[in-house]
């Protein structure tokens, strides 16, 4: 039944513009129900096809019209109004066929609808799929262009700052050298510009003075000798000596002086080690020879003092013997004086008796 309808539409002239289609569409709109005109926009072919489907499925118009409305439209170059016109004509012919009482087509309506509808949906999905596939990469590209790349990275060279008192000896040494080089560079720049330059604030001259001398580092190892109280010393002198032993003028006791001595010794040793490390090989050899000469000189002086102490030790023993003899004689003299006094008293006593 649909073949004569398709042939009629094929023989109709196809125009690229929509003028002829609009005229034919106006002729057929009078036959369409008013409900479809109210619900369907004129320029949208999708809504017109749904409206034609609703008009074909109204009560009293069941037949092949519903099936023909489900058929896909012909692929032409005409405007959407032409396709809607063709669908409207199909619906009109379907109504005529249904009014003619074609009962076999009415019985096969559900099966035909189930067969035609999936094809229409598949075509719609095929037409929409390329558009969606084209929009997706475009959207991703826009998102990538709109998104800013994170270019800030954590710095690999971080300054791990530490207070000076927490630095090790090597770190302090590097820091001091760096500061001295920087100060020398700044002073040279200021001197070149003609600005007054102050001397670099350092205590190197003090260390140089200590390096020239060789202080006795073993003074804190030996215990202090107790002051011997002689006969000619007074109690006040002894109290003053005891006060000096307990604490000095700075108010620190023996522990404080030992701490200062130990701290000075450690500082001097570190400085001496630094000076030796900075010396060249020739300078080290020269220093070693000087130390050997100094050692031999000290050994000779030590031997001389030892001999003198031995000789003085013999003299001291003789002096000690004489002192003991003097003490014995003094005690004996005192005893003789007491006895002499007693004898004098005894001699005076009988003379007084005779006088009475």
Swiss-Prot record:
Comp. bias regions, Polar residues: 48-58
Which locations, inside or outside the cell, does it occupy? Nucleus; Cytoplasm
Q: Which UniProt keywords apply?
A: Coiled coil, Cytoplasm, Immunity, Innate immunity, Nucleus, Phosphoprotein, Repressor, Transcription, Transcription regulation
Region annotated Disordered sits at 1-162, 210-259
Positions of the UniProt region annotated as Autoinhibitory acidic region: 207-247
Pfam families linked to this entry: HEXIM
From start to end residue, where is composition biased (Basic and acidic residues)?
1-11, 24-47, 84-93
In this chain, composition skew of type Acidic residues spans 233-248
Q: Where is the segment annotated Basic region?
A: 147-174
Q: List-wise, which residues carry Phosphoserine?
A: 98, 103, 230, 234, 249, 257
Look up the coiled coil feature and give its residue ranges. 280-346
Skewed-composition ranges (Basic residues) = 145-162
Q: Which GO terms describe its biological process?
A: activation of innate immune response; heart development; innate immune response; negative regulation of DNA-templated transcription; negative regulation of transcription by RNA polymerase II; negative regulation of transcription elongation by RNA polymerase II; negative regulation of viral transcription; positive regulation of signal transduction by p53 class mediator
Instruction: Give positions of region: Mediates interaction with CCNT1.
Output: 283-311
Which tissue types show expression of this protein?
Answer: Widely expressed with higher expression in heart, skeletal muscle and brain (at protein level).
Can you list the GO cellular component terms from the UniProt entry? 7SK snRNP; cytoplasm; nucleoplasm; nucleus
Q: Where is this region: Required for inhibition of ESR1-dependent transcription?
A: 307-352
Domain comment as written in the entry: The coiled-coil domain mediates oligomerization.
Quaternary context: Homooligomer and heterooligomer with HEXIM2; probably dimeric. Core component of the 7SK RNP complex, at least composed of 7SK RNA, LARP7, MEPCE, HEXIM1 (or HEXIM2) and P-TEFb (composed of CDK9 and CCNT1/cyclin-T1). Interacts with the N-CoR complex through NCOR1. Interacts with ESR1 and NR3C1. May interact with NF-kappa-B through RELA. Interacts with CCNT2; mediates formation of a tripartite complex with KPNA2. Part of the HDP-RNP complex composed of at least HEXIM1, PRKDC, XRCC5, XRCC6, paraspeckle proteins (SFPQ, NONO, PSPC1, RBM14, and MATR3) and NEAT1 non-coding RNA.
Q: What does this protein do?
A: Transcriptional regulator which functions as a general RNA polymerase II transcription inhibitor. Core component of the 7SK RNP complex: in cooperation with 7SK snRNA sequesters P-TEFb in a large inactive 7SK snRNP complex preventing RNA polymerase II phosphorylation and subsequent transcriptional elongation. May also regulate NF-kappa-B, ESR1, NR3C1 and CIITA-dependent transcriptional activity.
Name the family. Answer: Belongs to the HEXIM family.
**Designated name of the protein:** Protein HEXIM1
> What organism is listed for this UniProt entry?
Mus musculus (Mouse)
């Amino acid at each position: 039944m649909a073949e004569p309808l398709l042939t009629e539409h094929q023989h109709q002239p196809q125009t690229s513009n929509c003028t002829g289609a609009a005229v034919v569409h106006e002729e057929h709109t009078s036959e369409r129900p008013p409900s479809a005109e109210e619900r369907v926009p004129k320029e949208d072919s999708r809504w017109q096809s749904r409206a034609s489907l609703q008009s074909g499925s109204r009560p009293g118009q069941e037949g092949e019209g519903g099936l023909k409305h489900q058929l896909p439209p012909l692929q032409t170059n005409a405007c959407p109004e032409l396709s809607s016109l063709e669908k409207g004509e199909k619906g009109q012919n379907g109504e005529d066929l249904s009014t003619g009482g074609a009962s076999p087509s009415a019985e096969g309506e559900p099966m035909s609808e189930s067969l035609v509808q999936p094809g229409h949906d598949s075509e719609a999905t095929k037409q929409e799929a390329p558009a969606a596939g084209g929009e997706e990469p475009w959207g991703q590209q826009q998102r990538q262009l709109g998104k800013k790349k994170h270019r800030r990275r954590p710095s690999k060279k971080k300054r791990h700052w530490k207070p000076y008192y927490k630095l090790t000896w090597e770190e302090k040494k590097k820091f001091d050298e760096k500061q001295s080089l920087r100060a020398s560079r700044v002073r040279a720049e200021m001197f070149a510009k003609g600005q007054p330059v102050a001397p670099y604030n350092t205590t190197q001259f003090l260390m140089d003075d200590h390096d020239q001398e060789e202080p006795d580092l073993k003074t804190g190892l030996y215990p202090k000798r107790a002051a011997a109280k002689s006969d000619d010393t007074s109690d006040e002198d002894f109290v003053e000596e005891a006060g000096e032993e307990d604490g000095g003028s700075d108010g620190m006791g023996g522990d404080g002086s030992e701490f200062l001595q130990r701290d000075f010794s450690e500082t001097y040793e570190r400085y001496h080690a630094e000076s030796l490390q900075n010396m060249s090989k020739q300078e080290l050899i020269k220093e070693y020879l000087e130390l050997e000469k100094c050692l031999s000189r000290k050994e000779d002086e030590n031997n001389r003092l030892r001999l003198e102490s031995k000789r003085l030790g013999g003299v001291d023993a003789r002096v000690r013997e004489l002192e003991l003899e003097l003490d014995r004689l003094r005690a004996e003299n005192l005893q003789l004086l007491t006895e002499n006094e007693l004898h004098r008293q005894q001699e005076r006593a009988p003379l007084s008796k005779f006088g009475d």
